[in-house]
Amino acid sequence: MSQLSYQIPDNGRKKTLLRIPESHTLYLCPGSCGRRQGIRALKNDEADHASFLTFSQADIALGDYIGMVHDAADEVLDAIEPTPRVVTLYVNCIDDFIGTDGAALVEELGARHPGTRFLLSHINPVAADVRGNVAVDIHTNHYAALEPVPCEERDAGVNAVGGFVSVPDSCELRGYLEALGTPVLRELVACTTFDEYSALARSRFNIAVSHLGQDACRMMERRLGIPWMYWPACYDPDELARRYEMLGLALSVLLFDNVTDEGAGTSTAALRLDAAENLLREARVRATEATARALAAVGELPVVVVDTCASLMPFSLALALIKAGFNVAAVFALHSKGNDTEAEEELTREHPEIVVVRKQGLEAMAELGIPHTCVALGRDAAFLLRANHSPDMYHDEGLFGYEGIEKLMDSIAACMEHTERWDA
């Protein structure tokens, strides 16, 4: 019985597929390996933008692999109108054993089809190089088709990199940037044309909004000369204030340069800074008020559980909740990505009473002793504990800045108004 584990059901949450606009995806893999990508493309209405070239053992053994890829690329580009601006080749882990020269393959295809850019991404969970991360590498490759832009063609835009949903229009970040004279917040997920995608290279600053965006920002700093800062999910108002200060310092040079170019002088820049700071103060007040409402709604409930389904920074979220006054009892780190280690170390050092759950086995659940009358942040924890209350939260999506705190706290308060029903 020690090997008995729960299979946490997938409730059908749509998985976002990031794709460069006006691009096509060609999967190169054995038939069984492409099944998951095919099903996801169908579910996301992306089937028209994906093709599959499947290999048999004989194809690989006889050395027909590269020739088949060339033929498949020819066929895809002949069949699709208009011709894709970019074709991304996805190779599965079988390629790690074949040893394809990816750079040479991309160069050959580019010479064969000069109007189309070719990119290569690996889906290689069995690769020996554990330093790599498939999700990070794939995300980074989405920005590889951007071309350097001359300094005189740069604008005051800022890119948000690493997210699967847009920063909400109502988020104070957008108003803050606009007050500083940066009206454009660009995001790959919001691009609908290749020209919009190409404009990402015109921006003067990048914000990596998750660990997935860090390598992409490093690559863009190296290739395109765009500086950046790391801004993963954060629910601590004091830390947010520090980050906005860092962002303001990073953008202040651009702000003063812009108003000088406009002939308005430094007084205009100072007025803009004051307006931006006032906007942040108001947003923080709303977050504080929402936190008070959530604490009142939770009342005497003994626990609040955090899991990696809810947040990509579960330990940071747990610390923020403790700081706000919630009674955190456990962190479910079932799918920890290793990107929240500092907060994890602080939590285990300062709060040894909080349990960190790393497996979903039957014994792990039985030993916790957490009652059903709890608030579980994240569907995994909610399902395993049969929690009475669980706000809808997935990978911090739609939660950014002070508004993110406000929305999270309002969702916690709202979930207290009903009891979850779990099928036996």
Regions found by a protein language model. Give the residues of each.
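An N-terminal assembly and electron-transfer interface module characteristic of large anaerobic redox
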Residues: 1-424
